[in-house]
A protein has these predicted regions:
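Beta-lactam-recognizing serine transpeptidase/beta-lactamase-like catalytic domain environment
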Residues: 324-347, 352, 356, 378-442, ...
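Ordered, soluble secondary-structure elements with a strong preference for glycine-centered loop motifs
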Residues: 307, 710-714
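Short, gly/Ser/Thr-rich active-site loops of penicillin-recognizing serine hydrolases
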Residues: 601, 717-747
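Conserved NTP-handling cores and scaffolds of large molecular machines
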Residues: 36, 143, 271, 455, ...
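Membrane-proximal periplasmic segments of bacterial cell-envelope enzymes
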Residues: 1-341, 364-392, 398
Length: 747
């Protein structure tokens, strides 16, 4: 019995043991199947990655060219200093000392306890600390940074990487929590801890050569990176301004040689050297796809040092200018190398003409004198001769909508140049040609007429009497500009002996004519037409359909007729105004203005009567050709008259305008506190189209504004004349001027 019992017990144990072996084997087989069938490809990739060394190859940014092919911005060879995370975080000496101690101990290192290892490291640390201090001094000296600033930059690099590591660890902990795994895990190193990080840019080649040797002698400390910096050749240029056609008070046969700094800066823009959150979200370097795999965009952004267009054309065309990185993958087991070459960014040809831009900027510059308060202006008495007035001008090609020039004043740094600035310079960073908006005043009058004819509420030959004030019961509201005490309350009808047709109404800028058409159209239809002309599309404001309908609903006729002369609840940018006049010249086709050569496209067509357009152009021409035109001439007394616009070889069709402006806050001492608020300083406008006298075809649209300049004809008119002459000088209209007294030179 005893034997059988022992035998049975042994057999049971063997069976149990065998069962356990079978179960264990089954578990292993299932696990193996899971790893090979379900996770095999992922694990294989991971294993292969451990056998691969991968490096990214830098790309370079495309150039920005002007419409003639001149380079406005380009990448040129440069060198950057990059440091390791240990050096940035003050751990480089400790790591190097530990590596040396480990190397010197050899196989004995594994047998040493913690205290003996620490002793070995501490013995070597002073020398590595000395080398670290020497590195810091050398880096500060060669980078041109104060040592304190260098340490501040290094600290910022280390802190950024630490934050990234903490964020990665937090995500890993959350994932482990969801899976029910242990949370007692240390943070893993991240890629940025193994990479180099730029601390100084654009160092000389000799310095780069020196620091490369230093980096080789101090492994894991610094590297010199082949980089590129953005060169903008037109940052500084000289323009020779002919002054023989300026108004008599400042006219001279002696040209003015003017140095212009940054005349294209606000248009071309700039780049920054750091990727922001918005960049990382819009186009990340790595993105987890729907399948869970990591997808790499070699043109995407990575946290830290990146070249990114931050404003102007650099930002507008960022995705075209930005190239694709290359990649080199080296298989460590076989020494095979796979290489994907970088793809450079595309060149972008802008619509801007650099030389024309400089000429237009020079016309606005206070040193030329046209944007200084002058004796011939009709500006507020609170302004004095020599005060510098903010202004803007824009030129676009009618056929394409391409913007040829867009100038603004003041610009940053202009405060001490060419005239007293009576207002705050806080707005110097605004490009007034397309970022500021103003009531358009009388510039909308051609648009109102064309809209009225298109809607059938006015005939092409509509004639309307000017009785001085639109509402019979109110002689103090909705008046014509001529119905004033200083003009003895006369009217245009009295002046000509009858009603005005559109040509006379345009040339004389009769308010009553356009009050009438606006009243017939109603606010809703009028505002709809303004939007068709592009007003309110590019930064301006035009009452919405709901707001305009509400005006009609409450019977607010004064608000409606005010819109008919560009006053009230509307404001436009100079660019919008130029685009609207271009649409008039095209006969009803609206093309959105573009900064890209070849980028203009017809967006909408509102075909106007060719007769109506011809009448508008005749009226605009009479603004300067007829003695009664608001842009015709300036009287100097004694029967001496001076034409406002003279530009041999050109033909122009323009409209002047005076628009009510918000109070002007004078700050003459520049302390940021206004000493006086002026309410009678209107804005001066002038807009129109220009072509060659030879064929008489409108080819370019122009809009000019001088803030608080008073009358449009006497203040904005001479600026318009200078812009037209710039087009002549650059060969756009008339005969191209031969090289001679007027020139543009890049410095």
């Amino acid at each position: 019995m005893g034997y059988e019992s022992i035998h049975n017990d042994l057999r049971k144990r063997i069976i149990i043991l065998a069962a356990l072996v079978v179960v264990a084997a089954a578990v292993l087989i299932l696990r193996l199947g899971h790893l090979t069938l379900w996770q095999g490809s992922r694990l294989a990739r991971a294993a292969e990655e451990r056998l691969d060394a991968e490096a990214l190859l830098p790309t370079w940014r495309g150039s920005i060219l002007d419409r003639t092919g001149r380079v406005l911005a380009e990448d040129v060879a440069s060198y950057d200093i990059a440091v390791s995370y240990p050096l940035a975080g003050g751990k480089w000496a400790s790591e190097r000392a530990q590596e040396q101690a480990k190397r010197e101990a050899g196989s004995a290192w594994r047998k040493m306890d913690v205290s003996r290892r620490a002793e070995a490291v501490d013995a070597l640390l002073p020398e590595w600390k000395r080398r670290e201090r020497s590195l810091m001094k050398l880096l500060a000296s060669r980078s041109g940074l104060a040592e304190s600033e260098l340490r501040e930059r290094l600290g910022a690099i280390a802190a950024r990487i630490d934050r990234q590591r903490e964020a990665v660890h937090a995500r890993a902990i959350e994932l482990r929590r969801q899976r029910g795994q242990s949370l007692d895990v240390a943070p893993e190193p991240i890629r940025e801890m193994r990479e180099m990080h730029v601390v100084a840019r654009d160092i000389p080649a000799t310095t780069a050569f020196e620091l490369r040797k230093v980096g080789d002698a101090n492994p894991g400390s610094l590297e010199v990176l082949d980089a590129a910096r953005r060169r903008t050749p037109w940052d500084t240029a000289e323009v020779e301004v002919a002054r023989d056609h300026l108004p008599r008070a400042i006219r001279t046969s002696v040209p003015l040689v003017m140095r212009l700094d940054g005349a294209l800066d606000a248009i071309v823009g700039s780049v920054r050297h750091e990727a922001w959150k918005e960049d990382l979200e819009r186009r990340p370097f790595e993105r987890v796809g729907d399948s869970g795999s990591v997808e790499v965009d070699l043109g995407g952004y990575r946290a830290g040092s990146e070249v990114v267009g931050s404003r102007g054309l650099e930002r507008r065309f960022e995705d075209r200018l930005r190239g694709l990185r290359g990649r080199v993958t080296r298989r460590l087991a076989t020494e095979e190398e796979e290489r994907l070459e970088p793809v450079p960014g595309a060149h972008v040809q802008s619509s801007i003409d650099a030389a024309l831009q400089l000429r237009v900027q020079a016309a606005l510059d206070p040193r030329t004198g046209l944007t200084l308060v002058q004796p011939w202006h009709t500006s507020s008495d609170a302004l004095v001769i020599g005060d510098a007035l903010p202004a803007a001008a824009v030129v676009l090609e009618i056929a394409t909508g391409e913007i040829l020039a867009a100038a603004t004043t003041p610009r940053a740094g202009d405060a001490a140049r060419g005239g007293r600035v009576p207002v705050s310079m806080d707005t110097a960073g605004i490009h007034r040609a397309f970022e500021a908006k103003y009531p358009p005043g009388s510039l909308v009058k051609p648009l109102v007429y064309l809209a009225a004819v298109a809607e059938g509420v006015a005939a092409e030959d509509e004639a309307i009497e000017c009785n001085g004030h639109y509402f019979k019961e109110r002689s103090d509201a909705a008046r014509c500009w001529i119905y004033r005490d200083r003009y003895k309350f006369t009217t245009h009808t009295k002046s000509i002996g009858g009603p005005l047709g559109i040509e006379q109404a345009m040339a004389r800028s009769c308010n009553i004519y356009f009050y009438t058409l606006a009243d017939r159209l109603g606010a809703e239809r009028l505002c709809d037409w303004y939007r068709r002309f592009g007003l309110g599309r590019l930064g301006g404001d035009v009452p919405s359909a709901a707001v305009a309908k509400a005006l009609e609903g409450r019977g607010d006729r004064f608000a409606t007729v005010s819109l008919g002369i560009g006053q009230g609840a509307m404001a436009v940018t100079p660019l919008e105004m130029a685009a609207a006049y271009a649409m008039v010249a095209r006969g009803g086709s609206w093309i959105e203005p573009t900064w890209h050569k070849g980028g203009g496209r017809v967006a909408a067509v509102q075909p106007f009567s060719s007769t109506a357009v011809s009448r508008v152009l005749r009226g605009l021409e009479q603004v300067t050709s007829e003695s009664y035109g608001t842009g015709s001439h300036m009287d100097h007394g004694g029967g001496v008259r001076e034409p406002i616009i003279e530009a041999p070889g050109a033909r122009w069709w323009i409209k002047t305008g005076t628009a009510e402006a918000p109070p002007l806050r004078l700050d003459r001492d520049g302390d940021g506190v206004a000493e006086k608020s002026v309410t009678d300083a209107d804005h001066a406008w002038c807009a129109g189209v220009v072509g060659s006298a030879i064929d008489g075809m409108p080819r370019y649209a122009i809009a000019v504004i001088v803030e608080h300049g008073g009358g449009g004809g006497r203040t904005a008119g001479p600026v318009m004349a200078a812009v037209i002459r710039a087009l002549v000088e650059e060969g756009y209209v008339g005969a191209a001027r031969s090289p001679g007294p007027t020139r543009v030179e890049v410095r």
